Amino acid sequence: MGQDNSTPISLTLNHWRDVRTRAHNLSVEIKKGKWQTFCSSEWPTFGVGWPPEGTFNLSVIFAVKKIVFQENGGHPDQVPYIVVWQDLAQNPPPWVPASAKVAVVSDTRRPVAGRPSAPPRPPIYPATDDLLLLSEPTPPPYPAALPPPLAPQAIGPPSGQMPDSSDPEGPAAGTRSRRARSPADNSGPDSTVILPLRAIGPPAEPNGLVPLQYWPFSSADLYNWKSNHPSFSENPAGLTGLLESLMFSHQPTWDDCQQLLQILFTTEERERILLEARKNVLGDNGAPTQLENLINEAFPLNRPHWDYNTAAGRERLLVYRRTLVAGLKGAARRPTNLAKVREVLQGPAEPPSVFLERLMEAYRRYTPFDPSSEGQQAAVAMAFIGQSAPDIKKKLQRLEGLQDYSLQDLVKEAEKVYHKRETEEERQEREKKEAEEKERRRDRPKKKNLTKILAAVVSREGSTGRQTGNLSNQAKKTPRDGRPPLDKDQCAYCKEKGHWARECPRKKHVREAKVLALDNXGSQGSDPLPEPRVTLTVEGTPIEFLVDTGAEHSVLTQPMGKVGSRRTVVEGATGSKVYPWTTKRLLKIGHKQVTHSFLVIPECPAPLLGRDLLTKLKAQIQFSAEGPQVTWGERPTMCLVLNLEEEYRLHEKPVPSSIDPSWLQLFPTVWAERAGMGLANQVPPVVVELRSGASPVAVRQYPMSKEAREGIRPHIQKFLDLGVLVPCRSPWNTPLLPVKKPGTNDYRPVQDLREINKRVQDIHPTVPNPYNLLSSLPPSYTWYSVLDLKDAFFCLRLHPNSQPLFAFEWKDPEKGNTGQLTWTRLPQGFKNSPTLFDEALHRDLAPFRALNPQVVLLQYVDDLLVAAPTYEDCKKGTQKLLQELSKLGYRVSAKKAQLCQREVTYLGYLLKEGKRWLTPARKATVMKIPVPTTPRQVREFLGTAGFCRLWIPGFASLAAPLYPLTKESIPFIWTEEHQQAFDHIKKALLSAPALALPDLTKPFTLYIDERAGVARGVLTQTLGPWRRPVAYLSKKLDPVASGWPTCLKAVAAVALLLKDADKLTLGQNVTVIASHSLESIVRQPPDRWMTNARMTHYQSLLLNERVSFAPPAVLNPATLLPVESEATPVHRCSEILAEETGTRRDLEDQPLPGVPTWYTDGSSFITEGKRRAGAPIVDGKRTVWASSLPEGTSAQKAELVALTQALRLAEGKNINIYTDSRYAFATAHIHGAIYKQRGLLTSAGKDIKNKEEILALLEAIHLPRRVAIIHCPGHQRGSNPVATGNRRADEAAKQAALSTRVLAGTTKPQEPIEPAQEKTRPRELTPDRGKEFIKRLHQLTHLGPEKLLQLVNRTSLLIPNLQSAVREVTSQCQACAMTNAVTTYRETGKRQRGDRPGVYWEVDFTEIKPGRYGNKYLLVFIDTFSGWVEAFPTKTETALIVCKKILEEILPRFGIPKVLGSDNGPAFVAQVSQGLATQLGINWKLHCAYRPQSSGQVERMNRTIKETLTKLALETGGKDWVTLLPLALLRARNTPGRFGLTPYEILYGGPPPILESGETLGPDDRFLPVLFTHLKALEIVRTQIWDQIKEVYKPGTVTIPHPFQVGDQVLVRRHRPSSLEPRWKGPYLVLLTTPTAVKVDGIAAWVHASHLKPAPPSAPDESWELEKTDHPLKLRIRRRRDESAK
């Protein structure tokens, strides 16, 4: 080893593949990085002489191994590595140098001298023999320890000594009696491993086995293994590697394996491991077996009685361990999830080697592949390249010969790029240099231009004072005017010396005018004005800023802290430069605090206060004589804003605060203005239950304007400060909507929880109905207190599990909030919030109601009303209620409280003296509503006014004209009638009276009146002699009841208004008073006007013990309304109903004597796909009238037509008319009048069927002088005249339906048909003229042969050979041939099938709605011989899927098919599919396009599977068709087919094992003859079945299925014709033919014969063409003659 400078660690790394293979042979897993770390860094620190370069010295290896395996402070993760080191030293491979091998041998034979061991210390605790094995039972008894061996055996190192039985080690050393021992107490290196089964002496026989003794695992080992490894579900590789190493190194027993399974795995994981292990039990042939006896023998679930001191016992234990490890690996396999692997991306600062380890770990966790195997190297390499950092990825993708690079080579290349990356400082320096260089390039042209300008100025200034001459003689220069130059101290004005001209006393000084100089002409000019400066505190430091409104950003000269990454280019007078921005800085201005980022410009003369900060501070600059002054904006004005539905509050007069300050002092903790937000302390957190199958929904936040975001920010911040909102991370998200409060610029946050409300379970709403809430308030209680709870919903806590449902996005960069927020209290907008709060508050206030019966407490969600008969009771009750609310944690709004008053406002009502009034604010709201212009505005008006309908008598009558305008489907036209109704409602609202509160101790009286289809009434109670109104009721009757007689409409009105009155009376006695004898009508109802169900409903409501009817009265309060004022006289309702029942008083239903008798009937049936109908009239001997009716006429309609025609033909006569139609009979006698009275409308307000025929019948019924319409049974066999006449009418109806004479209309009587009179003699044409006439007629109509023949027959022309001429003309029409469809009738042929199963398959894709795992296609294979079907769900419809299923499913189970049939889909014609067929020798037959009948068997199976899946989904309630597919296949494979055999029986020769199959054959030899007999019989049965089916499938005599021959001209069908495009194209020349398809010239694919038809013969003589001319109104028609004709 010393000659080649190689070390043991370098040798192992250079031959790492061999080392890893050796580790696999030892059933352990090692990694290269950890191998190097443990050898060079970890083991040298143990202090046993391990060198950093490694060693093969067994003494040192065993010393390290002892520390690794020790009980306390051991290293379980290093066990596989030291075991492999030991194996390398004991069994050195060839690449270990000879010197190392010699050193090993010499080292193993040389005893190591050790220090004498010190005498053992006395134990602290007494020795205990019982070992705690957790919850596992005691292991089976093992033989006692044998005496110490006389000579050392070859176990452990050769020089190691066997341990003395009196000196226990292993797990016993970890017990309390051995815990003080030190590993260093041993005299030499110890090779013993702490094993559950360890050798205790020499074998008893020379060639016997070494006896073993059981040493259980210690609790510390189990705890370390449990805590130092991740769970099996998170990372199966960790525990799998641990147990593999334990199985090899510790040799655990069956009990130890169960203990490890129980400690290290969960119940579900343990069951999965055991199940997978039992699947991997090997049989005698070395393959996994399914025999239960062999499985139980090799892998028992109960404790076996194995003797581990025998060879058989040890062999069984070895098999058990191997099987358990195989089950562990099988359970560790996870479904392939490559998406998780693709999510592993290299971090910005992550080394490539670490990234590769993470990537390979992801492959192990999320795929069943081994990333270190050779087969997966390419996939791992591609993932490593594709998921690396962008710069590394770019470099690796440009490598040449990338396919030849290994993973190690790729990591090396990636490391080069990684280490060449620039640091953050280098990057900033580079960016700075680039910015400077960019700035220099930009300023270079400017500097050039500036240089030119300066040069021009200098040259211009120099040329102004020069002369053209004397350029070289400077001494001779003189002024231009010839005056001598002045001396230095000479005055230019007076020429005296001693002063200058500006100081000359002789010069007259002119007073300068005070003007404002706009330029200073180069001088300093006037003194500048004082500049406005302010001092602000930035991060605690006062800084004086110069206010500069021209600066866009505020500037600091020093950063005063950290500088952010943001940079800005500043353009100045000397050029541009890049300057940084600071991070957020805190500014204090008086009581305000603002955070702001400043631009740092060191060259700036002073800090600047720019427009950005001035705007944020709302600064104001004022200029005065003292100088400019800067002031900061005041606080925003606060406005009170109400909801839209509470707009009436804007018109309410301010209620003077009646709260005595003593109330605020007595109860300081209940008022929201003082105590803050409340919290219900006795209500548990609310748990929101989701619907079954609900999945998280994330709705993106809507765009929000800056103004709106700034408006709702204070509200969000307030809730954050109070803890009502908290940050969160949730898969749920709903948008936040800023709603602007009307009349102000303030916004409030409203969360759109509609998607959440859809996915949350509904609960029954228990919120009281405000309509009848005040009914429980006694009128004698006239002292009231009204309390309004503040932030009511926020008083209830929301369970933490339900809080993520209500998350929303919120970003506030100034406060540092970015992400999601959610509510910790019950949110507003949640559909169940009112019900949940109402129930919680009701439960909390239940004790108060029980302890205070002297007051009445009404609760509507968060609005409370306390009522009492006296002031003292009201005051005491209010005080106790406030105390109770304070104790419960609720808060009351002091501003809205109304305490101990006689007049209060509650729920929009004014309560006073036991009555309720409409508040003036509500009236003002309705009065200020403008005239509606849209249907929605009409609905809003009716909704707002409808709230006050109890105070408006006859509201439904007043609003009736407006209801049609609420529909969006009709045009909105506002007429005078609508305006009057609109004004009348407002006028009635102004005069609304006071309504008395219902007194439940007194009876009620309900006055009813019905006018114009509207039920009106007034509910009253008596007060002395007066009747006080409680409520005015009105409602519109339904369309059916509106058509009844007046008496019956009164019954419907009573039933309708009694329902509304019950909401106020709460089930008290009610007396009904009307102007009709209602009780007699209800008890003896007419059977012709209403159905039994409706009458039963009315009787259940009205014939009640609490409802009584008073005698009819002429005057009642309901008639005081502004309608007809005439009094209705008292009448007899039975007489009026009798008069209004029929349409004709003398109409009889019994035959009249001595008058003619007619029989009518109607028939309707379907023939040739069309519904035909006919109607006749017979008199018993002959047909009076008969006609066919238009196609699609029903039998009921035909009956009405026949009866109407009979009545018309009998005009002015006496007649008996029989009909067997109950529909026609009832319409004539009863229903017709009812239909007409109600406007021929159904109960839903729609037109009834056969409306026109019913009106015609009602008109015709008055035409005869006397008439009797009698009903007779149909289809009678008797010989009486009625039965005979009915049968003749039925036969005549069928004959009339098949006739060609169609009744044009049914509203006018039909005259009897008279034979046509021959007026003129027909004219005969020659054959040529006749053919020309037919040709011209066909060009005008383009009719077919039959219709054209009928048309010609109606003319007065005689044409020879008419039929042949018509056929010839129609067959030669080119337009008809290109457009008309053709029906082909051919003999049914036989499809080609296989001669045995698995030979001929048909395959097809069918699309189904998306199912589980994204499967939305079904790939169906069907064996044409047996009908056996195979179906596979797929995500895509590709050729790879087809090939995969053929190779993996069809070939292994059925063999290589000879023929595959499919359509021309892309997945079947692809090169991959056809190439596979070629390689396997499969004849892949592609069917003709647009001919699904060619794949009829698989297409029919597609339909069968879909229908079966639909039925199974309806039966089981399941929605995933993938789960139901096996059941559908089971039904398809076991459904009898054409021969009465199922596909299963044809394929396997016997019935499916669904039912009990009789005796089973065992493995005993006695059953071999029986088994042989069964097999022989099976072969015979299957052969007979196959031969019979094969004989049936043989093709018969070959017939010509189509008439097309080679050389024919044919037309080909267009399968997708466009608008106004011919159905056929062509003509084409036939080139080749088969029995079913034709090959034509010009089309590449074969065309099925059903898609062809013969081309018409073209006219050989001439053709016409249409040409366009230059004139826009002219066209040129040109005739061209065929050249061949010439």
Swiss-Prot record:
Bias (Pro residues): 137-151
Motif PPXY motif, residue numbers: 139-142
Domain (RNase H type-1): residue spans on this chain: 1152-1298
Pfam families membership: Gag_MA, Gag_p30, MLVIN_C, RNase_H, RT_RNaseH_2, rve, RVP, RVT_1
Keywords: Aspartyl protease, Capsid protein, Coiled coil, DNA integration, DNA recombination, DNA-binding, DNA-directed DNA polymerase, Endonuclease, Host cell membrane, Host cytoplasm, Host endosome, Host membrane, Host-virus interaction, Hydrolase, Lipoprotein, Magnesium, Membrane, Metal-binding, Multifunctional enzyme, Myristate, Nuclease, Nucleotidyltransferase, Phosphoprotein, Protease, RNA suppression of termination, RNA-binding, RNA-directed DNA polymerase, Transferase, Viral genome integration, Viral matrix protein, Viral nucleoprotein, Virion, Virus entry into host cell, Zinc, Zinc-finger
Motif PTAP/PSAP motif: positions: 116-119
Biased amino acid composition, Polar residues: 461-476
Positions in coiled-coil regions: 407-444
Amino-acid positions noted as binding Mg(2+) 4 in the UniProt annotation, renumbered to this chain: D1404, D1463
Signal sequence bounds: none
Swiss-Prot/TrEMBL site (Cleavage) positions: Y125, P126, L195, P196, L454, A455, L516, A517, L640, V641, P1309, Q1310
Annotated InterPro entries: Aspartic_peptidase_AS, DNA/RNA_pol_sf, G_retro_matrix, G_retro_matrix_sf, Gag_P30, Integrase_cat-core, MLVIN_C, Peptidase_A2_cat
Active site residues of this protein: D548 (protease)
Binding site for Mg(2+) 1: D788, D862, D863
Entry note: cofactor: The RT polymerase active site binds 2 magnesium ions.
Cellular component, GO, one term: host cell late endosome membrane
Zinc finger (CCHC-type) in chain: 489-506
Residues anchoring lipid (N-myristoyl glycine): G2
EC number: 3.4.23.-, 2.7.7.49, 2.7.7.7, 3.1.26.4
Single annotated GO MF: RNA-directed DNA polymerase activity
Record has Hydrolase as a keyword: yes
Sequence ranges assigned to domain Peptidase A2 in this UniProt record: 543-613
Binding site for Mg(2+) 3: D1161, D1290
Segments forming domain Reverse transcriptase: 720-911
Family from the record: Belongs to the retroviral Pol polyprotein family.
Protein's name according to its UniProt entry: Gag-Pol polyprotein
Native species: Gibbon ape leukemia virus (GALV)
Taxonomic lineage: Viruses, Riboviria, Pararnavirae, Artverviricota, Revtraviricetes
Gene: pol
